[in-house]
Amino acid sequence: MRFTILLPSAEGKEPGGNPLAPDMFDYRSSNTFNYFSDLNPERRALIDALQAEIRAADDAALEKLFGVKGDTLQKAVDANLGIYRSPLMAAVDRYGPGVMYAATDFAGLPTGSQRRLLENGVIFSGLFGLLRPDDLIPDYRLKMDAKVAGIGKASTYWREPLSKALNKLVDGHAVWNLLPASHEAAWDDAETYGRMIRVKFYREDEAGERTAVSHGVKELRGALVAYIVNETADSADALDLWEPPDGYEVDHEETELNEAGGGTVVMVSSPGWETRRAARRKARAQLEAEAAAAKRAREEEDD
C-alpha cells in the first residue's frame, strides 16, 4: 500500500542557500520544473500581492500580517521582498530549524528512509501551497492563516487549487495526516479518505485524568515521521511497535479505526510506562528467540 505523509511547513527557517542551484522550483518564470507545477500561477499571484502589501504597509500592519516585531519582522520583510532573487534550498532543509523537522532529523535518517520521506512527504505552505520535501525554495515568512491584501486568508486562497492537486495524488493511499488545524483548513477533503490516519497524544496523571498534549506535540510528530519512513508504515497497526519519547502507548479502547484502517489513533503517556515498555521488549525478545529456534529446528530436519 502506498502512503503519503501530510506535513505543515515551519516558521523557523534555515537562511541562505545555493545561488547557483538549478532552478528546479521555477516559480520565477513561465517554465515549470517543480513537482506541483500546476500551482505556479497561484504562487506568483500570492507572492506579487504579498510584496505589494509589504511596500504599502506601515509597521503596525506588517506586525499584524507576520505576527512578529523588531528584528524578526525586518528579516521577514527582507526575505519576502527578495523571494525572486534569493538563493534556494530544499524545503526539508529550509524548514530544518523548525521543531518538528529537527525532531525528524532528516540528515540523520538512513538513506532509504530519506528517500521514502522525499517520495511520500507533502508539505503544506502558506506561500507555495504544496511542496515536496526536495522542492527548492527561498527563505520567506507567511503563515497559512495570514491575511494578505487582495488575496484574503492564505488557507482559503489555497483551498481549491491545493485540494485538486492533493486529492488526485493521495487517491488510494494510506494518508498520515500530521497537519495542525490552520494547515488542514486549506484542504477540502471532499471524499473523506477511508485510509486517513490521525494521531492524538495525551498525558495521564496518577488520578487517571488526561490532558491533550500541546507543548511538545511537534517533537512527537517529528519522531513519528521518522518512525513512519524508517518502518515503511502504511497502517495504524504499525504504531503498536513504536517507542516514542516519554512512553506514549496506543490506547486501543479509545482509538477509533474504520474497516479501511483509517481513523484516529490515541496515544497516551501514563505512570508506569517504563515497566510496561520493558515487559513488552522482553516478551518480543522471547518470541523472536522462539521463532529463531523453530527455524533452526526446521532447517536441521531438512538436512
How would you label these PLM feature ranges?
Residues F106-T275, A283-Q286:
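Internal, well-folded beta-alpha domain core
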Residues E14-P15, W273-A278:
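Short, surface-exposed beta-strand/loop "edge" segments at domain boundaries and coil↔beta transitions
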Residues R2-L142:
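Near-N-terminal "mature-domain entry" segment
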Residues R284-D303:
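Intrinsic disorder/low-complexity signal
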